[in-house]
Amino acid sequence: MQFGVTVPNNWGIEDVNEALAFGPLAEALGYDSVWVMDHLFNNGYIRERLDDKPYYHPLATLTYLSATTSRVLLGTSVLVLPYHNPVELAKYTATLDQMSGGRVTLGIGVGAMTEEFEALGIPMSERASLTNECIRVMRELWSNPAPSYHSRRWNFDDLRFSPKPVQQPHIPIWVGGASPGAIRRAARMGDGWHPSGVSPEEYASRKAEIAELAQAAGRNVDNMVWSARVEVEATPGPSSERAASRSRIPGHDLEQTALSIAAYRDAGVEHLVLALNTGDVNRIRELMESLANETIPQFR
């Protein structure tokens, strides 16, 4: 079993260097991956948690971490794909894959915040089709020596696109979400499945559904990565009203933490991302260290 940890770009840490320091720390502690999240505005549950404190850009954060780490996978959990032009995003992430020596994984989702879609001028009703098409465009650019693509949104022929990513045929895309649409997307297009906040029971059920759909589509599920992101309670209780309705792992009792992780392992999770639910840098450091030294070795 592999373990990742979130770098708190989304927790309002006002000294950005304090947030960035958790990337090298995660690597030194033996974590397999570091992850960042994606939102544009402090609205809804984010405002409830941060007020006006900073939420840093995910790709800028990963770019910095690519230079301060050498081993850990660099992931997004998740990038809201409809917010990003796929041609520009393919270029950025391929460059980042080169800079990092092939360590980029894109966890992607369709998005859920109406205000952000409105601010970008993107119809929220098109978010699913946009997500699917963005995946196709990026893979065409990453993998084809002379990429071509035609749709009502994007049109190009016989272009020369560089750099190609280190990882071939393309950067891995792990599909986030557990909705029916996300399940179909993971089965048909995902290199992995990476939902957040689902219980072990739901994970096992949805995993079986994805495997069945993928096999029906002629895909080899043995090549898929089964991942999940779960909030770890740095202090007892959820971080927001939204988090209260989602599955969480206790962080104040390491025996219970291990039992919760075992349940995800038994449900079929291979790469578990631990999202520490605090902006208190001292508590983040303490919890990262205790998990790495006392809990994670039980699952290696």
PLM features per residue range, with description:
Residues 8-10, 39-41, 79-81, 109-113, ...:
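Active-site beta-loop-alpha junctions enriched in small/polar residues
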Residues 5-16, 79-87, 169-178, 241-255:
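Active-site mouth loops of central-metabolism enzymes
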Residues 44-49, 76, 82-189, 204-223:
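Internal, glycine-rich beta/alpha segment that forms the wall or movable "lid"
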Residues 28, 32, 125-167, 196-300:
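An alpha-helical appendage that flanks or caps ligand/catalytic pockets
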Residues 14-26, 89-92, 175-185, 250-263:
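Short, acidic/polar
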Residues 1-68, 169-171, 275-290, 299:
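N-terminal beta1-alpha1-beta2 module of alpha/beta enzyme domains
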Residues 68-71, 100, 187-193, 268-270:
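Glycine-enriched alpha-helix->loop->beta-strand junction motifs that scaffold or abut catalytic
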Residues 3-7, 34-36, 74-76, 104-108, ...:
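Hydrophobic faces of well-ordered beta-strands that scaffold small-molecule active sites
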